[in-house]
Amino acid sequence: MTAQIIDGKALAEELRQGFKARVEALTAKGHKPGLVVILVGADPASEVYVRNKVNGCLAIGMHSEKITYDATIDQATVLNKIAELNADPNIHGILVQLPLPKHFDEEAVLEAISAEKDVDGFHAENVGALAQGNPRFIPCTPYGVMKMFEKGNVDLTGKEAVVIGRSNIVGKPMALLLINAGATVTVCNSRTKDLKFHTSRADILVAAVGKPKFVTGDMVKPGAVVIDVGINRLPDGKLCGDVDFASCLEVAGQITPVPGGVGPMTITMLLANTIEAAERKAGL
């Protein structure tokens, strides 16, 4: 068996083409969607992510800007800027690129963003709404994964789903979305005993652990849908995911590649959330 590859890059482009008409309609009514990304420090990976987010917005006609601070900036300055952006009617989405320098209280910064402009879906109010099954904004990576399930005609109802990783950014919201979709969900972490026992029973396997090629083919149930959220850079400079693609490709029914899988969908759903925020503000 050779798995069907779920092409996240192609799906992302298809969705973005559809977004253009929504952006044009909003702009014509004086509600051009606007996203501001705040970057503290000069982490090379974060700079790439921020550039891709800003360029993604501009490519479909949205307004976007990057605000950069030196890593030594005090937290109060950033909080004051967030308060200013919260009050700006032309800005519909505010995103603070993580991680922040160690002297920052990450939770306090994320909570300072208005829940109505929290397009990352990290504000406690939005996390609670997601847990209740009535989300305002879905965190972008899990949102992208759900769109991939939708595109691949993956029926989640009654399926055994295993999520490896329990981060607030991916693992926890991913588990909630799967629960809300009717799956039976197990969340595994670094302390899980006999991980293979759980993964080998999974109809849906989501790997978000941050370890290169961590999930191997012998851990996968034949015919399973394998979603690789990881992005890891190897010593030779190449990118790979948390899944050993070659071995899992021969066992899985559907699988996402790295690169070209979940990654492009993450930024695409950030655009979706920002457009949705603008539509709500416009009463559409």
UniProtKB/Swiss-Prot annotation:
Q: Give the UniProt keywords, A-Z.
A: Amino-acid biosynthesis, Histidine biosynthesis, Hydrolase, Methionine biosynthesis, Multifunctional enzyme, NADP, One-carbon metabolism, Oxidoreductase, Purine biosynthesis
- Matches recorded under Pfam families: THF_DHG_CYH (PF00763), THF_DHG_CYH_C (PF02882)
Pathway of this protein?
One-carbon metabolism; tetrahydrofolate interconversion
Tell me the GO molecular function terms: methenyltetrahydrofolate cyclohydrolase activity; methylenetetrahydrofolate dehydrogenase (NADP+) activity
One GO-annotated biological process of the protein: L-histidine biosynthetic process
| Annotated Gene Ontology cellular component terms | cytosol
Per its database record, what is this protein's job? Answer: Catalyzes the oxidation of 5,10-methylenetetrahydrofolate to 5,10-methenyltetrahydrofolate and then the hydrolysis of 5,10-methenyltetrahydrofolate to 10-formyltetrahydrofolate.
What is the protein name for this chain? Bifunctional protein FolD
Identify the species of origin. Dechloromonas aromatica (strain RCB)
Report which gene this protein is encoded by: folD
